[in-house]
Amino acid sequence: MNKHIIFGVHITDRFRHVPEAQSLFTEYGCNIKTRLGLHEVENYCSPNGMILLEMYGDEVRCLELAEKLAALEGLEVQKMVFTHD
């Protein structure tokens, strides 16, 4: 059985908190298959945003990234896991 792991990372005050998160994205870059950034842009550029990460590789290493991101100020991490044969 394979697992398809996706993290949703909510970032508040992204201009202040993204640099630390970006450092972790770089460190774990080989485990990030897809990265999608979302933020509100109508009438203004929102200071808050959402990043979706489709993970790849060793599950322990992927979960390690989630723990490190969640430990950063201004970030919240939610996990989705889909299993399939």
Predicted regions and their residues:
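Long, contiguous binding/interaction regions
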Residues: 1-85
